[in-house]
C-alpha cells in the first residue's frame, strides 16, 4: 500500500466532498477543491512529468513552493509517477537548500511560478544557460546541472561491492544478524515516498529517504486512534520539510476528511490563527508542537482552543518535550472534552513511533503531579527499545531510546539497501518505570530549540570557521538563550559575524546574542569553564549601558538599520519603504523575536505589544508604536500611546461587555469632578502618576509598561526628588552576602547614613497599615500622607511638617492601606467592619460606603485606564467598584479569604488576587471572570507583584513563586521560613526584594537566583522599598523593616548595611520613601517620618 493508493481509495468514495481548503485570511473567500479536482489535477501533473522527465536510477522530484490550494495535488502528482517528492523550503538558507539538493543529486525540481525569481536568484549556480525548463499550470519544471557531484545515488545493479560495504556499515548499528539477508532497496520503482533532511544541528545534516512501507502504518494507525471520518477538518500545521506534515496531509485525504491550509505568515499571528481554525473552519484534529500551541497564550487556549465549545476533538502534541500536567490542566477550559495525545518520534524513522492518550481522569484531577507524561505504546509496526550504555536492552532504569521495526526503516544519506528491522539510535534518554517510558532529555550537548534538535557544538564549529573569530564557545544560558562568546581582534565585526552565521546556520541555530570577550576561561583540566562564561554573560546583561537616542530622526535611522540587518537586506538599500511589511520582506517568527530584542536593547526598555505590531504592521507603524513609548510628546503623543496600548491589551476582544461600562464610568467622573494631576507613592516602590504627563516628561519618568497617565503601576521608577530623573543601580557582585556583625554594629559602607525622627503623629492605637503619599504636580508643598490605624482613625498628614490635615473615625479597625482615585478627589480604604470607605481626599468627608460580608484587610488597587477600584474581602470575594456611579461592577468568588492586596497588570490586562486558601488567581478586570488559577497548597498572605514578564508572590511554605502572565510557573526560590512579606522589584525589573520570617532580607534576579541576602535581628513581615539616595550619588538603596521595630537601610546592589534605626514598638507597616524622608507606621501608635541623612548632610 502506498500513500497515493490510500488517497485514491478515499476519493473513490468521496469524489464530491471537499478535500482541501486554502484560506489566505485576507478578507477574501477561501478556495475549495473537491477530491475529484485534486485527483484530476494530480493525474495531469503525473502525465506532464512522465512526458518531460528522463528518469535514470532513483526517481526523486524536488518541490519548491509555499503552502497553497494546489499543494496536495502537486504532491500526489509526483507520487503517482511514481517518484518521491523532495520538499525545498523557499525561506531556508540557500546554502542549506543547495547542500541538500546536491547531496540528493536532484535532477528535476518543480518550482511554483510565484517563487521563480527567488529560486533563480538563490540557486543560479545550478542553472546553465541552456537549462531545461517547461511550464505546467502554476509550476515550472527545471532540470538541474551538477558539477563535481560528491554523492551519486543513481546506482546500477553492478555496484555490488559498494552495497556490501553499506550492509557491513549498517550492521554495526545493532542490526539483528538473523535478518541480514532481508533488505529494503530504495531502487525499487515504488519504494520511496519522500525525501527530507534532518536539521543538521545534531551534526552534519542527514538525508532521510522514507519508503511508503515506513510511513503508511502511521497513517493507518492514526485513522483508527483518532477515529477520523469524512466530517473531520485537519489543519496543515507543519511545513513540508517537517515530516509530521505527511501525517497531516494523508490522514485527512485517506479518510474523506478536509485539509485546511493557510499561509505561513498567518501561523505567526496567534489571535488570527485561532479565529481561522476554530471560528471560521471549525478544525477538529490538530497535530502540533507544544511551542505552536504556547504561541496562542494560555488565555486564548483556554477560551478558544480548549474551551467547552471548541470544535477540536483531537490534539496531538509532539516534536518537543510534552508540557507538564499542571500546565496542561491550566490550559483546559471547564467542560472541555478534547482528547489530548503525546506523540514521539524521530525523522530517521519517519514520522511518529509512540503515542499516549492523556486519560480524562488525569486531566480532570486536582492532585499535583510532578511526573512527566509517559511516551506511551509503540505505533503499528514500530519496535521501541531502551538500551543501557553497554547496548543491552533494559526493562527498568535509564537508557537511550532506539526505534525501528521490520518495515519501519528509512535510508540515511547514501544507504541504498537497509536490513529490515534496523534499529536507529535517537539520542534521547528516558527512564523506564513499571513498563512505562518517561522522557529525560537529549544526549550530551544536543538540545531541542524551537522544536528542532540542535547540537550547540555545531554552532561553535561554524563560528570558528569564520576568519574574524579567533576562538569561541557556545552556552545554552539558563536553558533559554543561546549565547556565542567570541575572541576577536576586531571589536567592530560583531554585526558582520552575525550576518555570516545567518547565512550558514538554519534559523533555529542562530545565537540569541554574541558577546565579545578578551579570552576564553578554562578549568584546571584545560576545558572551557561554562560556569565562568555564564557569570560573564550575567555581568554583560547587568552592566551594559543603555543606548541613548538623540531624537525621533535617530530612532528612525536606527530602526531602518536594524530592519536591514535582521532581514539580511543589501547594505546599499538606501531607505526601507514606509509600507514595508516584515513577513513579506523575508522575516519569520525567529527573526521577529530577534528584531524585538534589538529594538528593546536600542531604546533601553520593553515595548509592550511590539511583537504583534512587527508581525502585522508596516515599518512606519512599528516606528510610531515605538515612538509613543520611548519618545513621548508632552500632550498628543502620550494620549495616542494610551489609546494604542489599551487597544493592544484588549486584542482578543474578550472585554466587549465591560468596555461600555468603563466608558460610562469615566464619563461620569469627568463630568462631575475636578481632575487633579498628581504622583502617588505606596508600599513596595509602587509609583503611579495620574494626569501629569507634562510634569513626568520633565522628570524623565515616562514608562513603557503603563498607559499615558501612569508612570508605574509596578515599580517602574523611583523618585529621587521632584527635580531630577532616577538612575538605576545594578548588581556588580551577585555572590555578595552581607549581614549584621555579632555585636549588632552595621558593616562599613561606602557612605554611612543616619536616621533621625523628623516628626511623628499619634493615631491612638497600633498602625499596621502602610502609608500612601500623594504629591500634587503643581503644589509639591502640599504633599500628603494618608494612613489608617487600629484606633478606627483615618488620617491625612502633611508630609513635610507632620501636621494633621484631617481625621475621620471609621466603624472599626483599619489595617488596609489607602488607595487614591483616578481623579485624585477620593481616598479608598477597607475596614474590619466589612465596609469599603470612599472619603473625600481634601476633607475626609464620607462620600460612599460599600458593604462586603466580612472584614476588609486587603488594600485597594485602582485601574488607571478605567478608574475602577479593585479590592478583596475576608468574605472570599473580590470586588470591582465604580465609585463615581456608587455601584459594584462585578463580584467574583475567589475560593478563599482575600487578605492580601490585588495587583493590576496592564499588558496583558490581568488582575491578580491571592487567597488564604493558597490560590493565586488571574481575573479579567472588566468582568471578574477567572483567566487562570494556581494552587500553591499553603496560605498566601503576601500580595502578588507584577513586572512586564512575570508575577511573583511569597507563600507561607517559605517559597517565593514566579509565574508568567499566562499561569506557567517559571521558578521558585526557597527560604527557611514563611514569607508574609510582599515582593518588591527594582526599577530595572532585574531584581526582586522580599523578606522572610527566617529573619533575612533577600535579593534575587528574575531567574530566581540569589544575588545577596541580609540577616536582620527579627522576622521580616513588611514589604521593602527601593529608592534613590538623595545625597546626589547614583546609589540605589533599599529600606526594609523587621518586626522588632528596626528600620534597615541597605545598599541594593550588594545588600551592604548603610544604617539602622530602632523604633519603640513592633513594625508590620511597610516603609515609603520620598526625597530624604521615610514614612512608616509602628505598633507604638505613631506614624513616623524619618530623615535619611548621608555623610555630606550631617
Swiss-Prot record:
Gene Ontology BP annotations: amino acid activation for nonribosomal peptide biosynthetic process; beta-alanine metabolic process; fatty acid metabolic process
Domain Carrier: 553-630
Enzyme Commission number(s): 6.2.1.-
Keyword Nucleotide-binding: yes
Cross-referenced Gene3D superfamilies: 3.30.300.30, N-terminal domain of ligase-like, YVTN repeat-like/Quinoprotein amine dehydrogenase
InterPro entries attached to this UniProt entry: AASDH_AMP, ACP-like_sf, AMP-bd_C_sf, AMP-binding_CS, AMP-dep_synth/lig_dom, ANL_N_sf, Beta-ala_Activ/Resist, PP-bd_ACP
Record keywords: ATP-binding, Fatty acid metabolism, Ligase, Lipid metabolism, Nucleotide-binding, Phosphopantetheine, Phosphoprotein
Tissues where the protein occurs: Ubiquitously expressed in adult tissues.
Residues annotated to bind ATP: 198-206, 428, 442, 527
CDD domains assigned: A_NRPS_acs4 (cd17654)
Keyword check for Transmembrane helix: no
Role: Covalently binds beta-alanine in an ATP-dependent manner to form a thioester bond with its phosphopantetheine group and transfers it to an, as yet, unknown acceptor. May be required for a post-translational protein modification or for post-transcriptional modification of an RNA.
Name of the protein in its database record: Beta-alanine-activating enzyme
Species of origin: Homo sapiens (Human)
Phylogenetic placement of the source organism: Eukaryota, Metazoa, Chordata, Craniata, Vertebrata
